């Protein structure tokens, strides 16, 4: 765009990863971007806030990434927070009773790099390992048509047809796929499961896990700073209620957006050259115009369902484990993240090294829909955020851990007390040191609409970034990104929306997507 032309204006509804990725890419390309976010902070479902009652800054749920997430890593590099991710090459599996096993890569070429560790897994029999190895080969090396495409069959059905033992399902496939896709195996499509397996096997680096070392909202506030530094604007506590644009026109008028300022409860109307709807599917359906052009979109959106994830935050009076994270087998809780070891304090060391000092969250705002507001209004908040204070602030050398339960439908209607009791019972099974530890305080966060359910047949209903309105585009991890509902999928959707928008604006050569992680070793023969 020439310097003599005014910058085209873009409204982006949604300040989650999809909206922020699109905004950063467009701000770098000469567009004047305004991001509208209904909450008082950025990050969407990947956010944090000061918990009312514990006084601690907590993430709404633990988020991790892997080296295969090339667009998410590029996004972090773009906004200057790549150094706030801690990377791990090894993964520890723990059985009830406390026996642990480490999976690590060997010098063998992909996909054999983890074979030595896998063959030494004591919690799988040789029969289990043979069955799993054959299934991995079918999913990654010579996938049949029902694996390459969504054949309307669940992964659990596929496992039964491919002679997977019950132990292989419970102790291998469930820990990997339920955590990755936030859904039960009988509701996961084969193609979604196969993609997770293929991506993890393509190189030794693919399975390296990254964990944010600062609160999530602090991480994504950097994206807000990045956008503002390039002439953009972030408007928090402002929600898009509806929009108006002429469909299928070569030269349509600007897009009119109808907004509500949640601070002063005022409604307003503004016009922009373009609009990106970076909203969850269940929110998008409410803002679509009541016109015939919306009908096809609405029909597709009816096929989506939400999957919940529950995070259980526990503060103990002593260190219960020397591990930073671990996969937990055979119980309700699937992962443990040792936050007092993971989080970086202002001096740059982990909390454990700082004698229990609380991690600061300089720009972490309170959620307007948090338990605190609901308490003031007298509402029951048992489905959102629940608190149990047992004592005062965390003691020096204490442990703060977060436990994660993906696909946690069976926990949604349980009380905080029941969930904390369950978590304590299981933690003490896995970590003997926890049996003598005193629980200081706890919090339970239920993210009811954490992801979409990757059910068989759903791929056909994931929408592209373009819409019937030539100046309106879609972003979100639920759109047709080629990836499941992950942070990587969200960023990809934002970049795809930005590419579609720049093409509509006449910039045909704009590309924002990063290349996929290259296959190495023998996997190069099958990529």
What are these regions (language model features)?
Residues 238-246, 253-346, 365, 384-385, ...:
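Mid-domain catalytic core of redox enzymes
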Residues 27-52:
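Glycine-rich FAD pyrophosphate-binding loop
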Residues 72-73, 77-78, 82-193, 201-206:
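Mobile amphipathic helical/loop "lid" adjacent to a hydrophobic cofactor/ligand pocket
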